């Protein structure tokens, strides 16, 4: 990922709801205090505090989650990185070698993942075994039983349903390829400048419910901004309904998380002998230091924690889907598949035990008609953001941008499907609520990225402790 898709975080309006008090900072403060002194206590619109999240994530969840994400089921992600940008034509492709993505060869992918039936449970796999050679899942063989045809068509309909928050890739396209996420990690790539700024600017300016008259703090594509614009922006933000305010904070948190990754896996040394990746303290400070960012950095970090709570809550709500006996993490290796499902359920039950979950019941409450319209606006705005990922000029940035937006979109889909999840049958096909393998892989990897960001904040806090 790019230097500074990346440096954008210094400029673009990642937001929180606290006012800035950095004009009163004293020179004697440490660098850690300038980045983290206001990243503590309770989060806005939540009943949870930063310290509780740190303890839960760093010591109870993070190690097990990383082990799960290293398994075959979660490391291989099918993606189309050749889809054209739907919004503009002048994309400048990053030519740096670190922007490139190395796709998998066919023989590197487990057979169970390559088969068309990987999306479904073991019971469903048996039902649709005869259709694996169909060009698309919807092309149902007429010789199949009526029950099987119904199941396949229901799944196809579901995958294209209006409940989805993302513009899904056509993974049957010849341009779609499997990528090993462990061999193509999210890190600094050198992608920077106006092309990268443009992506985030379009996201914030056109898809976050913000009128053009309201100026975001530290926007590199706007000039002449000052304290009055910042005050106007936060007055506007605080006046939004909780749903729109949350939407902005989710995008801000995602942006902040990406920048933590880039600072933590920065190219420190590049010689013909080796490349050395590690923590770049200066880059982290440029993005999150309270003085250098005029108070924006700590706000952005708090929004990262807000994003963490939203995705954590979604995982706690979807436990019944994964507990169903016919669900499996199907790769074709029965022993490993069973072990990984046990690990998955262990992680999900740990998440469910978290004492201070976000309460999503405040979302889309009130008048039903207005709530439904707001929910649809929410969904369409996020879906548009997922389409913007096809405009990113750095392929590795595009890969991780698409995965993380799909993961967040899947989390939102789960949060707004509570009744459907509650009504799922204990066994057999679930027609009303379903997750594809793409959604499952993106959901857990996206949360893994946020979990990693929270863990890296502890590392940066320690590194900055003795720096002034």
Curated annotation (Swiss-Prot):
Superkingdom as given in the UniProt entry: Eukaryota
Disulfide bonds: 35-48, 37-46, 85-391, 94-99, 94-131, 99-104, 208-241, 394-397
Enzyme class, broadest EC rank: oxidoreductase
Record membrane topology: Peripheral membrane protein
Binding site for FAD: 187, 189, 200, 252, 255, 287, 300
Cofactors: FAD
InterPro entries: Ero1 (IPR007266), ERO1-like_sf (IPR037192)
Biological-process GO terms, alphabetical: cell redox homeostasis; intrinsic apoptotic signaling pathway in response to endoplasmic reticulum stress; protein folding; protein folding in endoplasmic reticulum; release of sequestered calcium ion into cytosol; response to endoplasmic reticulum stress
SUPFAM superfamilies the record matches: ERO1-like
Means of activity regulation: Enzyme activity is tightly regulated to prevent the accumulation of reactive oxygen species in the endoplasmic reticulum. Reversibly down-regulated by the formation of disulfide bonds between the active site Cys-94 and Cys-131, and between Cys-99 and Cys-104. Glutathione may be required to regulate its activity in the endoplasmic reticulum.
PTM info: The Cys-94/Cys-99 and Cys-394/Cys-397 disulfide bonds constitute the redox-active center. The Cys-94/Cys-99 disulfide bond may accept electron from P4HB and funnel them to the active site disulfide Cys-394/Cys-397. The regulatory Cys-99/Cys-104 disulfide bond stabilizes the other regulatory bond Cys-94/Cys-131. Phosphorylated on Ser-145 by FAM20C in the Golgi which increases its enzymatic activity. Phosphorylation is induced by lactation. It is also induced by hypoxia and reductive stress.
Sites carrying sugar chains: 280, 384
EC numbers on record: 1.8.4.-
Signal peptide residue numbers: 1-23
Subcellular locations according to the entry: Endoplasmic reticulum membrane; Golgi apparatus lumen; Secreted; Cell projection, Dendrite
Chief location bin: endoplasmic reticulum
Annotated positions of the Phosphoserine modification: 106, 143, 145
Keyword set includes Amino-acid biosynthesis: no
Keywords for the protein's UniProt record, in alphabetical order: Apoptosis, Cell projection, Disulfide bond, Electron transport, Endoplasmic reticulum, FAD, Flavoprotein, Glycoprotein, Golgi apparatus, Membrane, Oxidoreductase, Phosphoprotein, Redox-active center, Secreted, Signal, Transport
Stated family: Belongs to the EROs family.
Function: Oxidoreductase involved in disulfide bond formation in the endoplasmic reticulum. Efficiently reoxidizes P4HB/PDI, the enzyme catalyzing protein disulfide formation, in order to allow P4HB to sustain additional rounds of disulfide formation. Following P4HB reoxidation, passes its electrons to molecular oxygen via FAD, leading to the production of reactive oxygen species (ROS) in the cell. Required for the proper folding of immunoglobulins. Plays an important role in ER stress-induced, CHOP-dependent apoptosis by activating the inositol 1,4,5-trisphosphate receptor IP3R1.
Subunit structure of this chain's protein: Predominantly monomer. May function both as a monomer and a homodimer. Interacts with PDILT. Interacts with ERP44; the interaction results in retention of ERO1A in the endoplasmic reticulum.
Protein name (Swiss-Prot/TrEMBL): ERO1-like protein alpha
């Amino acid at each position: 990922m790019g230097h500074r898709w990346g440096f954008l975080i210094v400029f673009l309006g990642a937001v929180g709801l606290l006012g800035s008090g950095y004009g009163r900072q004293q020179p004697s403060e440490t660098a850690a205090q300038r980045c983290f002194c206001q990243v503590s206590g309770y989060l806005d619109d939540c009943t949870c505090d930063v310290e509780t999240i740190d303890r839960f994530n760093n010591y109870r969840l993070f190690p097990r989650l990383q082990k799960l994400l290293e398994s075959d089921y979660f490391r291989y992600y099918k993606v189309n990185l050749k889809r054209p940008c739907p919004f503009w034509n002048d994309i400048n492709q990053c030519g740096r070698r670190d922007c490139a993505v190395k796709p998998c060869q066919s023989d590197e992918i487990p057979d169970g993942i390559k088969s068309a039936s990987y999306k479904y449970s073991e019971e469903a796999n048996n039902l649709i075994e005869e259709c694996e050679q169909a060009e698309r899942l919807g092309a149902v063989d007429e010789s199949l039983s009526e029950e099987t045809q119904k199941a396949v068509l229901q799944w196809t309909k579901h995958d294209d349903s209006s409940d989805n928050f993302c513009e899904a890739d056509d993974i049957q396209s010849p341009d779609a390829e499997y990528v090993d996420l462990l061999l193509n990690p999210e890190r600094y790539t050198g992608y920077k400048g106006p092309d990268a700024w443009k992506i985030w600017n379009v996201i914030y300016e056109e898809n976050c419910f913000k009128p053009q008259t309201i100026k975001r703090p530290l926007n590199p594509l706007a000039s002449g901004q000052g304290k009055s614009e910042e005050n106007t922006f936060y007055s506007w933000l605080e006046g939004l309904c909780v749903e729109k305010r949350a939407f902005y904070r989710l995008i801000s948190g995602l942006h902040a998380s990406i920048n933590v990754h880039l600072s933590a896996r920065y190219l420190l040394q590049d010689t013909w002998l080796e490349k050395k990746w590690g923590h770049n303290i200066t880059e982290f400070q440029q993005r999150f230091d309270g003085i250098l960012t005029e108070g924006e950095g700590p706000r952005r970090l708090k929004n990262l924690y807000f994003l963490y709570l939203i995705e954590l809550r979604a995982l706690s709500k979807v436990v019944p889907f994964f507990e169903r006996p016919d669900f499996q993490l199907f790769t074709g290796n029965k022993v490993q598949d069973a072990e990984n499902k046990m690990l998955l359920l262990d992680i999900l039950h740990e998440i469910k035990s978290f004492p201070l979950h976000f309460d999503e019941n405040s979302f889309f409450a009130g008048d039903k008609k207005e709530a439904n319209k707001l929910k649809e606006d929410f969904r369409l705005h996020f879906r548009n953001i997922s389409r913007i990922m096809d405009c990113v000029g750095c392929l590795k940035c595009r890969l991780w941008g698409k995965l993380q937006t799909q993961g967040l979109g899947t989390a939102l889909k789960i949060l707004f499907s509570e009744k459907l999840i509650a009504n799922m049958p204990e066994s057999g096909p679930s027609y009303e609520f379903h997750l594809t393998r793409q959604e499952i892989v993106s959901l857990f990897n996206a949360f893994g990225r946020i979990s990693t960001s929270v863990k890296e904040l502890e590392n940066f806090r320690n590194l900055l402790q003795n720096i002034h």
